[in-house]
Curated annotation (Swiss-Prot):
SMART domains: AAA. The complex is composed of two ATP-binding proteins (PhnC), two transmembrane proteins (PhnE) and a solute-binding protein (PhnD). It catalyses: phosphonate(out) + ATP + H2O = phosphonate(in) + ADP + phosphate + H(+). The gene is phnC. It is an enzyme of class 7 (translocase). It is found in: Cell inner membrane. Belongs to the ABC transporter superfamily. Phosphonates importer (TC 3.A.1.9.1) family. It is a peripheral membrane protein. Keywords: ATP-binding, Cell inner membrane, Cell membrane, Membrane, Nucleotide-binding, Phosphonate transport, Translocase, Transport. It comes from Pseudomonas entomophila (strain L48). It comes from the Bacteria. This is Phosphonates import ATP-binding protein PhnC. ATP binds at G35, P36, S37, G38, A39, G40, K41, S42. The lineage of its organism: Bacteria, Pseudomonadati, Pseudomonadota, Gammaproteobacteria, Pseudomonadales.
Length: 264
């Protein structure tokens, strides 16, 4: 089992971002998380990545309980997990080649990591992953000169170069045009299938989620609304998931009730 959440909750100050989440994601599974803005998709991914600690419940990641480990052991565990941000945090003056190679900083010693900032240690490796994303011509360009969609492709290239066992992607194609978005998600899925990588992506574009991922998890108001194979997701389920999103209506807290989460 790659990821297991048991009654997991997460609070941001007074806001309950996630509540009573139970999920199991096996090795090599490819899963899309969908839901309205503010539903908790990013919070769920960051919880899985150990970027934040659950305020309730338990996370098991790659057979470990991260928050029971020493800080050093937790860092080594994180090196086995890739995280692609919606807006990759890349310094504007950093060259693309350095940004991509930084994917393995958690696996390298301190000296090699520092030397890589001065003289990139694996230019062919960076070039190979960038070529798959149509970005090889940007190898030595500074990140500050790239568009939002290009920066997202650099973030994906960085994660692919890292070669993680679990790859978590948070709205990885939101700034790309439809053709590039489709190509990038297809590439991520091919890579995951070829290498047995567990792939989890949060996506706002439902059509991309259904087209590329065998399993779909719907999140609404910080809770799992449904967990089904893509072919079992119905328009009725989607209507309920996204109800009132276009109106920007706040979620009204309701009394806790016991529900059966559909898992098809």
């Amino acid at each position: 089992m790659s990821i297991r959440l048991q009654e997991a909750g997460l609070r941001h100050g007074q806001v309950q971002a996630l509540n009573n989440v139970d999920l199991q994601i096996g090795k090599g599974e490819r899963v899309a998380i969908i839901g309205p803005s503010g539903a908790g998709k990013s919070s769920l991914l960051h919880l899985m990545a150990t970027a934040v600690r659950p305020s309730a419940g338990q996370l098991d990641l790659l057979g470990e309980q991260p928050w029971l480990l020493t800080s050093g052991a937790r860092q080594r565990l994180r090196a086995r997990v890739g995280l692609v941000h919606q807006a990759p945090p890349l310094p504007p003056r950093q060259r693309v080649v350095t940004a991509v190679l930084a994917g393995r900083l958690g696996q390298w010693g301190t000296l090699r990591g520092l030397l890589n900032l001065i003289h990139p240690s694996d230019v062919p490796g960076a070039r190979e992953v960038l070529a798959e994303l149509g970005m090889v011509d940007k190898l030595f360009v500074q990140c500050g000169q790239l568009s939002g969609g290009q920066l997202q492709r650099v973030g994906i290239a960085r994660a692919l170069y890292q070669q993680p066992e679990v790859l978590l992607t948070d709205e990885p194609v939101s700034a790309m045009d439809p053709v590039l978005a489709d190509h990038s998600l297809a590439l991520l899925n091919r890579h995951a299938q070829a290498h047995g990588v567990t792939l989890v992506a949060s996506l706002h574009a439902v059509e991309l989620a259904l087209a590329h991922f065998p399993r779909i998890i719907g999140i609404r108001a910080g809770e799992v609304a449904f967990d089904c194979p893509a072919e079992a997701v119905t328009p009725t389920m989607l209507d309920a998931l996204y109800a009132n999103e276009q109106l920007g209506s706040p979620v009204v807290p309701t009394a806790t009730v016991l529900v059966q989460i559909p898992r098809c």
